[in-house]
Amino acid sequence: MLETVTDVASFVHYGNTSVFPTADNSSEIIPDGESNISKPHRCLQVLYDDIGTSRVRYWDVMLLIPNVAFLVFLMWKLPSARAKIRLTSSPIFVAFYILVFVVAAVGITRAIVSMTVSTSSAATLIDKVLWEITRFFLLAIELSVIILGLAFGHLESKSSIKRVLAITAVLSLAYSITQGTLEIRFPDKHLSAKDFNIYGHGGRHFWLASSCFFFLVYSLIVILPKTPIRERISLPSKRSFYVYSGILALLNLVQGLGSALLCADIIEGLCCVDVTTFLYFSVFAPLIYVTFLKGFFGSEPKILFSYKSQIDEPEDSDVHLPHTSSSGLGRKDLDRGSYSSTQIDGSGAYLDDVVSGPFGGAHSINSVDSDRWRSINT
């Protein structure tokens, strides 16, 4: 009798179907307020509830809207972004920009396809495969960002970037295959509703192990600048990279705690992993953009062009090889300076210091008398 009561209570707690005692066994079950629950936990229900009579789930819409909004933003910034990317010699910015596009596109594709499938067993399998494909791309990008961020100053060629992407793709594929095998062959019974088996990220135990692993990785990255290793290797100086790592460390910590609660059969842990799953699959791409690309794309194009034209002028000998006398300045040099006010305003004081140097103030550019300039012009 005790076993029968336990089975019924467990099923109605996680499933979506009420179980009522029949006439044969009604005397064996004494209903009370706790065992007569007809609805699953709200944190489980949000994962599969449909909008009205449609087959579209709230969960898919919640994940679709942020990805669509971010993709629209990327398309809006695309013309100016392409113009700025052409000006940089570093392939890392190009790689990051392509990666965020891929993340947004894959997230939208998964949500749309999941909305169109039914609740049959084949549709459930398709939905889980789409989740694994999305997770594969996200993890590949996540690992690539870690490596490229830590080795930002050491990877300057396209071939090295491609090698990093290839390595992270292989690692992500191995992870996704393992997770997908556990998810399809050994689905988590805690995430079953009606005839629809909800995607469980490989089960509670795999979820817990992976969350703890990534929490340790990102926590180590955050504390690296405080360790003696900073004197042996070159670490990123950009503060936003460590903020990014700290956010993901916190995300994996909460996800690990939620998974641990699920392993202890505490259904409230599902609320934690619901929040972390939503944040990861909807906010991860914007986080990469803000961390690594916002500052680069936020600069004005003319500044980049102006900087490039200044460093590429081959005949600007005044800065690199200053004359010891102002009489060495020819008419050609003066004429060229007339249309480059930025260079004059920005470097006039510097040239005064360099030219006057050990020769005193008599030969300073700004202290040359008008008679000397008049004799040069004539």
Curated annotation (Swiss-Prot):
Range of residues in the leader sequence: none
Glycosylation sites: N16, N25, N36
Region of interest: Disordered: 316-335
Membrane disposition: Multi-pass membrane protein
Transmembrane segments: 61-81, 88-108, 136-156, 164-184, 205-225, 247-267, 278-298
A Pfam family reported for this protein in Swiss-Prot or TrEMBL: Tmemb_40
GO biological process, one term: G protein-coupled receptor signaling pathway
Gene Ontology cellular component list: plasma membrane
Protein known as: Transmembrane protein adipocyte-associated 1 homolog
Encoding gene, per UniProt annotation: tpra1
